[in-house]
Swiss-Prot record:
<dbReference type="GO" id="GO:0009376">
    <property type="term" value="C:HslUV protease complex"/>
</dbReference>
<keyword id="KW-0547">Nucleotide-binding</keyword>
<feature type="binding site">
    <location>
        <position position="38"/>
    </location>
    <ligand>
        <name>Zn(2+)</name>
    </ligand>
</feature>
<dbReference type="GO" id="GO:0051301">
    <property type="term" value="P:cell division"/>
</dbReference>
<dbReference type="InterPro" id="IPR003593">
    <property type="entry name" value="AAA+_ATPase"/>
</dbReference>
<comment type="function">
    <text>ATP-dependent specificity component of the Clp protease. It directs the protease to specific substrates. Can perform chaperone functions in the absence of ClpP.</text>
</comment>
<dbReference type="GO" id="GO:0005524">
    <property type="term" value="F:ATP binding"/>
</dbReference>
<dbReference type="Pfam" id="PF06689">
    <property type="entry name" value="zf-C4_ClpX"/>
</dbReference>
<comment type="similarity">
    <text>Belongs to the ClpX chaperone family.</text>
</comment>
<dbReference type="Pfam" id="PF07724">
    <property type="entry name" value="AAA_2"/>
</dbReference>
<protein>
    <recommendedName>
        <fullName>ATP-dependent Clp protease ATP-binding subunit ClpX</fullName>
    </recommendedName>
</protein>
<dbReference type="GO" id="GO:0046983">
    <property type="term" value="F:protein dimerization activity"/>
</dbReference>
<keyword id="KW-0479">Metal-binding</keyword>
<feature type="binding site">
    <location>
        <begin position="119"/>
        <end position="126"/>
    </location>
    <ligand>
        <name>ATP</name>
    </ligand>
</feature>
<feature type="binding site">
    <location>
        <position position="13"/>
    </location>
    <ligand>
        <name>Zn(2+)</name>
    </ligand>
</feature>
<dbReference type="GO" id="GO:0051603">
    <property type="term" value="P:proteolysis involved in protein catabolic process"/>
</dbReference>
<dbReference type="InterPro" id="IPR010603">
    <property type="entry name" value="Znf_CppX_C4"/>
</dbReference>
C-alpha cells in the first residue's frame, strides 16, 4: 500500500502524506483529506501573494475615474462637494501622469500637489486618508508645527519620507507612489511679508526645506530615522511621484482676502453686514496665490502646490449628517459596540441635534462630536456590560444637555409589552 493511500484504519493527508496521528486535525473532502499543517501553509502562500500584489502599488489600469473616487469620498465625508471634486480630479491626473511618465517620447507632465484650506474639523485629514484607502497606496501624515530646517532641534523634513517608508513596510518602490498629508501647513508661514534677516527655523526655513521633496528629489533616508546613527546605511527614495497634500485652517487669511476684495474692516466705512454674512469658508473660496504670498509663503512654495481646494465650515445640518450617515459614522460605531453586548442603541433626532449644537459651540468642527458622545455615554457604557438583562438604550437630548441618564429598557419590560 502506498504512503498516500488512505484506509479506514489509517487516514493520511492527500497533500503531505502525514497520518492522522501525526497531525492535529485531518479534514475530509470528496475522496481527499487535508491536514491543519497544509491548510496553514496554503494560507501563508495566499497571504504572501496578496502582499506581493499590494507591493506593486495602485493598479493604474484599474485606476478609478474621478466620479468613482468622489462616490467613495461621499460615503465617508459629508458636504464639501467642490473640494471632493478638486481632489478626485487631481488624484486621478496624478496617477495617470505616473502611468504615462514611463513611456518614452510622451509629453512630460508636472506633478500637481494639493493645498487644502478650511476650518478645524471640516474634514481635511479624513479626505486625505480616504483617498489613500481608495487607491490602496501607502499613506503618511505629518504635523508641520514639529518640522524645522536641518541643523536645528526638531523633526527633519526627511522624517516625513521615513514615515511613508514605514507605512510601505520599507518597500521603496511602493513608497514612491504613496500619499503624504502635511497638517497645520499654515503654521510655517513666515512671520512677515518681507524676507527675514534672521533665521526663522519654523517658518521660511521649513518652507525651503520642504521645497525639494515636494517637487521631486532623491532623498537619503536612514532606516531607523534621525541623525544619531551616522554609520547606518541610507535608503534612496525618489519623491517625484509621491503626492503631497497640505492642509491648514489659515487663521487670519480671511483678513488678507478682505483687504484685496475691498471689504473694509475698520473705520466709518466698514461694511459690517457683508463681513458678518461672509463666513471664513466662503472667504477662502476667493483665495489667490497673491493672498498666500502676503500671508507669509515664499513664491516657490506656493508654486509647488498649484491645486487649491477650499473646505467650508460645517453647519448644524451637516453635523447631524456626519453623526449618522457616513459608512463609519459615530452613531453606527456606538451601535456596533452595544450590539456586541446584545443591546440595541437608539438616538432620538433631538439628541443628534443637541450633539451637533454642542460641537458648534466648541468651535472644533466634526472633531468635537466624539468627545461629546464619550462624555455623555460614559456611565451607561460602564454599566451595560454588567447587566445582561438590558435590551435597549435610548439617548435623548436631555442626556446631552442636562447629563440625565439614558432610557434603559430591560428584558422583562419587553416581555410584558409583548
Amino acid at each position: 500500500m502506498s504512503r498516500r493511500e488512505t484506509t479506514q484504519e489509517n487516514l493520511t493527508c492527500s497533500f503531505c502524506g502525514k497520518s492522522q496521528e501525526e497531525v492535529k486535525k485531518l479534514i475530509a473532502g470528496p475522496a481527499v483529506y487535508i491536514c491543519d499543517e497544509c491548510i496553514e501553509l496554503c494560507n501563508d502562500i495566499i497571504a504572501e501573494e496578496l502582499k506581493m500584489e499590494e507591493t506593486l502599488g495602485p493598479d493604474l489600469k484599474k485606476l478609478p475615474k474621478p466620479r468613482e473616487i468622489k462616490d467613495v469620498l461621499d460615503e465617508y465625508v459629508i458636504g464639501q462637494e467642490k473640494a471632493k471634486k478638486v481632489l478626485s480630479v487631481a488624484v486621478y491626473n496624478h496617477y495617470k501622469r505616473i502611468e504615462t511618465s514611463n513611456k518614452p517620447g510622451d509629453v512630460e507632465m508636472q506633478k500637481s500637489n494639493i493645498l487644502l484650506l478650511g476650518p478645524t474639523g471640516s474634514g481635511k485629514t479624513l479626505l486625505a486618508q480616504t483617498l489613500a484607502r481608495i487607491l490602496k497606496v501607502p499613506f503618511a501624515m505629518a504635523d508641520a508645527t514639529n518640522l524645522t530646517e536641518a541643523g536645528y532641534v526638531g523633526e527633519d523634513v526627511e522624517n516625513i519620507i521615513l514615515s511613508l517608508l514605514q507605512a510601505a513596510d520599507y518597500d521603496v518602490e511602493r513608497a514612491q507612489k504613496g500619499i503624504i498629508y502635511i497638517d497645520e501647513i499654515d503654521k510655517i508661514a513666515r512671520k512677515s511679508e518681507s524676507p527675514s534677516l534672521t533665521r526663522d527655523v519654523s517658518g521660511e526655513g521649513v518652507q525651503q526645506a520642504l521645497l525639494k521633496i515636494i517637487e521631486g528629489t532623491v532623498a537619503s533616508i536612514p532606516p531607523k530615522g534621525g541623525r544619531k546613527h551616522p554609520q547606518q546605511e541610507f535608503m534612496k527614495v525618489d519623491t517625484t511621484n509621491i503626492l503631497f497634500i497640505c492642509g491648514g485652517a489659515f487663521a487670519g487669511l480671511d483678513s488678507v482676502i478682505q483687504q484685496r476684495i475691498g471689504m473694509k474692516s475698520l473705520g466709518f466705512g466698514a461694511d459690517v453686514k457683508k463681513r458678518a454674512e461672509k463666513k471664513l469658508g466662503e472667504l477662502l473660496l476667493n483665495v489667490t496665490p497673491d493672498d498666500l504670498l502676503k500671508y507669509g509663503y515664499i513664491p516657490e512654495f506656493i508654486g509647488r502646490l498649484p491645486m487649491l481646494a477650499t473646505l467650508t465650515e460645517l453647519d448644524e445640518d451637516a453635523m447631524v449628517q456626519i453623526l449618522k450617515e457616513p459608512k463609519n459614522s459615530l452613531v453606527k460605531q456606538y451601535q456596533k459596540l452595544f450590539e456586541l453586548e446584545n443591546v440595541r442603541l437608539r438616538f432620538t433626532d433631538g439628541s443628534l441635534v443637541a450633539i451637533a449644537r454642542e460641537a458648534l459651540k466648541r468651535n472644533t468642527g466634526a472633531r468635537g462630536l466624539r468627545s461629546i458622545l464619550e462624555n455623555s455615554m460614559l456611565d451607561i457604557m460602564y454599566e451595560v456590560p454588567s447587566q445582561p438583562n438590558v435590551k435597549e438604550v435610548v439617548i435623548s437630548e436631555e442626556v446631552i444637555y442636562h447629563k440625565e441618564k439614558p432610557i434603559v429598557v430591560y428584558e422583562q419590560q419587553v416581555s410584558d409589552a409583548a
